[in-house]
Curated annotation (Swiss-Prot):
<dbReference type="GO" id="GO:0005524">
    <property type="term" value="F:ATP binding"/>
</dbReference>
<dbReference type="InterPro" id="IPR038019">
    <property type="entry name" value="PRib_AMP_CycHydrolase_sf"/>
</dbReference>
<feature type="region of interest" description="Phosphoribosyl-AMP cyclohydrolase">
    <location>
        <begin position="1"/>
        <end position="118"/>
    </location>
</feature>
<dbReference type="InterPro" id="IPR021130">
    <property type="entry name" value="PRib-ATP_PPHydrolase-like"/>
</dbReference>
<dbReference type="GO" id="GO:0004635">
    <property type="term" value="F:phosphoribosyl-AMP cyclohydrolase activity"/>
</dbReference>
<dbReference type="GO" id="GO:0000105">
    <property type="term" value="P:L-histidine biosynthetic process"/>
</dbReference>
<keyword id="KW-0378">Hydrolase</keyword>
<dbReference type="GO" id="GO:0004636">
    <property type="term" value="F:phosphoribosyl-ATP diphosphatase activity"/>
</dbReference>
<keyword id="KW-0067">ATP-binding</keyword>
<dbReference type="GO" id="GO:0005737">
    <property type="term" value="C:cytoplasm"/>
</dbReference>
<comment type="similarity">
    <text>In the C-terminal section; belongs to the PRA-PH family.</text>
</comment>
<keyword id="KW-0511">Multifunctional enzyme</keyword>
<keyword id="KW-0368">Histidine biosynthesis</keyword>
<dbReference type="InterPro" id="IPR026660">
    <property type="entry name" value="PRA-CH"/>
</dbReference>
<dbReference type="InterPro" id="IPR002496">
    <property type="entry name" value="PRib_AMP_CycHydrolase_dom"/>
</dbReference>
<dbReference type="Pfam" id="PF01502">
    <property type="entry name" value="PRA-CH"/>
</dbReference>
<keyword id="KW-0028">Amino-acid biosynthesis</keyword>
């Protein structure tokens, strides 16, 4: 596409919805003008236009929390963008994973959607932990130790699942499977592989074949 395919408003701006490419959660909404859009495409990192300061700003230039662009999509009218990114830290200036952490109804926000219930909740929570790295959190500990530690835990939990199943201990089995699923989700996040891509493989395998 060409920048001329986009429709900017009377102030020369277009809204950009920024989405975590892995968890698919919306992390912020900002505005771009023609120049910031072109710099985003050129550099592969997000650039926006500040309406209050009336100047371009490179996300993460000061904090280091840059956003690597994976894809940019535009709607049918060409007057709104969705920017899929890999986060290099929190998206919000408050230090939160997402700017959308308050609920009108007072609900606890993990950033999860209704795609597949608790799996989406865990995926979003793990993404939040990786971005914010809160001290004392077990998930923070795993990310700090790195892939070898995460793989070790996946192996340990898989072994526990086998033992529980071998012993025909249904109560223990469900707990061990839950632990294994959690550590697999941490591994997927570390590997930058969205759960959606795993689900797509399952869907493809079980899709009825055309005659």
């Amino acid at each position: 596409m060409n920048v001329d395919d986009l429709t900017f408003d009377d102030k020369g701006l277009i809204p950009a919805v920024v989405q975590d490419a892995q968890s698919k959660e919306v992390v912020t909404v900002a505005y771009m003008n023609r120049e910031s859009f072109e710099k985003t495409v050129e550099t592969g990192e997000t650039w926006f236009y500040s309406r209050s300061r009336q100047e371009l700003w490179h996300k993460g230039a000061t904090s280091g929390h840059t956003q690597k662009v994976v894809d940019i999509r535009y709607d049918c009218d060409g007057d709104a963008l969705v920017v899929l990114v890999e986060l290099k830290g929190p998206a919000c200036h408050t230090g939160k994973y997402s700017c959308f952490f308050e609920s009108v109804f007072g609900k606890k926000i993990y950033g999860a959607s209704d795609r597949f219930g608790i799996i989406a909740t865990l995926e979003a929570l793990i993404a939040e932990r990786e971005a914010e790295m809160p001290e004392g959190a077990y998930t923070t500990y795993l990310f700090e130790k790195g892939v070898d530690k995460i793989l070790k835990k996946v192996g340990e939990e898989a072994t526990e699942v086998v033992i529980a199943a071998k012993n025909r201990d249904a109560e223990e089995l469900k707990w061990e499977v839950a632990d294994l699923l959690y550590h697999l989700l941490v591994l997927l996040r570390e590997q930058k592989l969205p759960v959606d891509e795993v689900l797509a493989v399952l869907e493809e395998r079980h899709r009825p074949k055309e005659e």
